[in-house]
Amino acid sequence: MKKLTKTNSHRQQKLASIINEALIEILRRGKMLDSRLFNCPLTITKVIVTADLKIANCYFLPFNTKLTINEVMNALNNSKKAIRNFITNKINVKFSPDIRFHYDHGFDNAIKVEELLKNIQVLGDKLNH
């Protein structure tokens, strides 16, 4: 019987962890990055590496920034070469994975779910009175 869920291999998880740590370090240092990222606090929420280890999907969440999501995405993409070089020096693999940045919608979705639950509770309270 086939598994319904796909699990990441140990190599995928280890590489994702190393990339996550390297991203945090280079973003903290700020060297070689697009200048728009200097005053833009970012959290790398997760890194998912494909099974062939060729692509690393990196999810981010900006905090307290005047930049739009697209501006942050463009700044990260402009810094991609420097980020990839930095990561290449941190990992020991034949080929460095292509880094792809994605906005993490998880926080926004959690807020929406919380609002929906509050609305349901308010409606339930109105029906009970």
Swiss-Prot record:
A Gene Ontology BP annotation from the UniProt entry: maturation of SSU-rRNA
A GO molecular-function descriptor: ribosomal small subunit binding
Keywords, sorted A to Z: Cytoplasm, Ribosome biogenesis
Superkingdom of origin: Bacteria
Entry keyword Cell division: no
GO cellular component terms, A-Z: cytosol
Keyword Cytoplasm found: yes
Coiled coil (residue ranges): none
Gene3D superfamilies xref list: 3.30.300.20
Cellular compartment(s): Cytoplasm
Protein function: One of several proteins that assist in the late maturation steps of the functional core of the 30S ribosomal subunit. Associates with free 30S ribosomal subunits (but not with 30S subunits that are part of 70S ribosomes or polysomes). Required for efficient processing of 16S rRNA. May interact with the 5'-terminal helix region of 16S rRNA.
Family, similarity comment: Belongs to the RbfA family.
Subunit structure: Monomer. Binds 30S ribosomal subunits, but not 50S ribosomal subunits or 70S ribosomes.
Family matches, as NCBIfam families: PRK00521.2-2 (NF001799), rbfA (TIGR00082)
Stated name of the protein: Ribosome-binding factor A
Source organism of this protein record: Rickettsia akari (strain Hartford)
